[in-house]
Curated annotation (Swiss-Prot):
Family as reported in the entry's similarity comment: Belongs to the long (3 C-C) scorpion toxin superfamily.
Function text: Binds to sodium channels (Nav) and affects the channel activation process.
Protein name per UniProt: Toxin a
Domain LCN-type CS-alpha/beta: 3-28
Signal peptide bounds: none
Organism (species): Androctonus crassicauda
Organism placement in taxonomy: Eukaryota, Metazoa, Ecdysozoa, Arthropoda, Chelicerata
Record's keyword annotation contains Secreted: yes
Length: 28
């Protein structure tokens, strides 16, 4: 799951860069 916030998106609409912990995706 993406954490809402101001972050760039990759071509799949996922935050990048990010760190994935379990089922959670933390945008950094």
């Amino acid at each position: 799951a993406d954490v809402p916030g101001n972050y760039p998106l990759d071509s799949y609409g996922n935050c990048y860069p990010c760190t994935i912990l379990g089922d959670n995706q933390y945008c950094i």
